Regions:
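Bacterial N-terminal signal peptides
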Residues: 1-5
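Acidic, surface-exposed loops and disordered segments
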Residues: 8-200
Length: 200
C-alpha cells in the first residue's frame, strides 16, 4: 500500500502547503504527522475512557529530560466539572468578555490540562513533547485535538479553578488540549521550509 511523506521538491524559501509523494512502503507515523489538523469544532459525542487511557499512556511515554517526567496531567470529561471550572475562570477574569472565557475550550468534550514544574528549566520542553504525543496518538485513533494557550491565562488568575484541578504545589498549567470527534475537515496550512537549513 502507498503512504505519504513530505516532498522536498519545492523551493526552500517559499511558504507552501505540505506536499506529499507516494512511496512503496506504508509508514503510519509519517502519515499521521502529515495528516493531523487542529480541530476547533467538535461533535457532542464523548471520547470513551478506554481510548483516552491509551492516548494518555502514549503521552507519558514521550521523551523527557533525565526521565524526570516533570509534568502533571489532569483530564476533565465531565460536563458538570467543566462548567464549574469555566465559572471559576469567568469570575476570576472580570475584565474579559464572559463569552470569550466560555468559548476558550472550543466546546471540546474532553479537556487535558498539562502543568509543568518551574523548578526544572527543561520542564516546558518535556510538557510539549508529552502534548505532541497525545495529539498524534489521538489522531491515529480518529480523535481530533487542538492545543490551546488562552485557557492557561484564565486558569492562572483563578485559585478556585486551580484547586479544582488539583495540581501538586508548585506546578503551573502550561498547555491545554481539547479532544473530541471532529465536526470539521480543515485544509492544510502553508509551512515555511525556508526556516529549515542544513549547516554546511
Amino acid at each position: 500500500m502507498a503512504c505519504f511523506c513530505l516532498s522536498a521538491a519545492a523551493a526552500c524559501n517559499q511558504q507552501q502547503k505540505p506536499q506529499i509523494m507516494e512511496t512503496k512502503a506504508k509508514n503510519e507515523v509519517i502519515e499521521t504527522i502529515m495528516a493531523r489538523r487542529s480541530i476547533r469544532k467538535y461533535k457532542a459525542e464523548p471520547v470513551d475512557r478506554q481510548t483516552m487511557q491509551q492516548i494518555l499512556e502514549c503521552g507519558i511515554n514521550a521523551p523527557n529530560g533525565m526521565n524526570k517526567q516533570s509534568w502533571e496531567v489532569r483530564v476533565v470529561d465531565n460536563p458538570e466539572v467543566m462548567a464549574e471550572i469555566k465559572g471559576y475562570m469567568t469570575s476570576a477574569n472580570p475584565d474579559m468578555d464572559p463569552a470569550m472565557v466560555e468559548g476558550c475550550f472550543r466546546d471540546a468534550p474532553t479537556m487535558i490540562f498539562v502543568a509543568n514544574d518551574p523548578s526544572y528549566d527543561c520542564s516546558p520542553v518535556d510538557c510539549g513533547l508529552l502534548s505532541q504525543n497525545i495529539m498524534l496518538s489521538a489522531w491515529s485513533l480518529g480523535v481530533g485535538s487542538v492545543c490551546l494557550g488562552s485557557p492557561v491565562r484564565f486558569l492562572l488568575n483563578s485559585p478556585e479553578a486551580m484547586a479544582r484541578l488539583g495540581f501538586s504545589e508548585g506546578y503551573r498549567p502550561i498547555i491545554c488540549i481539547g479532544l473530541g470527534y471532529a465536526d470539521e475537515t480543515p485544509e492544510a496550512k502553508p509551512r515555511d521550509m525556508g526556516k529549515v537549513r542544513f549547516v554546511e
